[in-house]
A protein has these predicted regions:
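Polar/charged side chains located within well-ordered beta-strands of beta-rich proteins
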Residues: 2-3, 20, 24, 62, ...
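Acetyl-CoA-dependent GNAT
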Residues: 10-11, 18-89, 94-95
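A generic structural signal for beta-strand entry/edge sites
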Residues: 83-85, 121, 155-158
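A short, internal acetyl-CoA/4′-phosphopantetheine-binding micro-motif in the GNAT/acyltransferase core
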Residues: 91-99, 126-127
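Conserved acetyl-CoA pyrophosphate-binding loop and the N-cap/start of the following alpha-helix
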Residues: 97, 101-109
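Conserved active-site alpha-helix within GNAT-family acetyltransferase domains
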Residues: 104, 128-146
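Conserved GNAT acetyl-CoA-binding A-motif
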Residues: 114-126
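Conserved catalytic-core motifs of GNAT/GCN5-like acyltransferases
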Residues: 125-126, 141-160
Length: 166
């Protein structure tokens, strides 16, 4: 079932962290190598919380879309204003829930919601080697738009493609 959150208060943050656990562990190891793995994970989760509360949800039109199964978050994505449309970011499925079509279900339901609300076009930056994400995006109607990514802050990443959904 699709769940849309327009504020941090509308999210179960602990449940969201279960979806992003793998990425948070990687971020903790990268940004806090001097800490124990548990402390580094807690710091990465706090950084994530701070980003959502102080930056992400401060933008008009920013939202989180989540796919729930039996009341638990299994897949998530963020959307925020970008150029003449929106930027889809952080599409993730909990590692123990992968391979069950949850990302496709989330994207399909969310894109229907976005189209009904007139929230198009939608862009997404995907690492060139991230085949699972490319497959999900392609199956849901995205096409490669550019051979690089230009982020909201203006930085450019040549290791990513920009995909577009109309």
């Amino acid at each position: 079932m699709l769940h849309i959150a327009y504020s941090l208060k509308e999210l179960d943050f602990a449940a969201l962290m279960a979806v992003y656990g793998e990425g948070n562990r990687e971020n903790g190891e990268y940004f806090y190598p001097e800490l124990t793995p548990g402390e580094a994970l807690r710091r990465a989760e706090q950084d994530f919380y701070d980003y959502l509360s102080q930056d992400f949800f401060q933008a008009d039109g920013a939202l989180y879309a989540l796919w729930e199964v039996q009341g638990a978050y299994v897949s998530a994505l963020r959307l925020e204003p970008y150029r003449e449309g929106y930027l889809l970011e952080a599409l993730e499925t909990a590692p123990d829930k992968r391979g069950r079509g949850y990302a496709n279900s989330l994207m399909g339901a969310f894109l229907t919601f976005a189209r009904e609300k007139g929230m198009l076009p939608i862009y997404s930056h995907i690492r060139k080697g991230n085949v699972p994400s490319q497959r999900v995006h392609s199956a849901c109607g995205f096409t490669v738009y550019k051979d690089l990514a230009v982020y909201i802050d203006g930085s450019v990443d040549y290791k990513c493609n920009t995909w577009k959904f109309l």
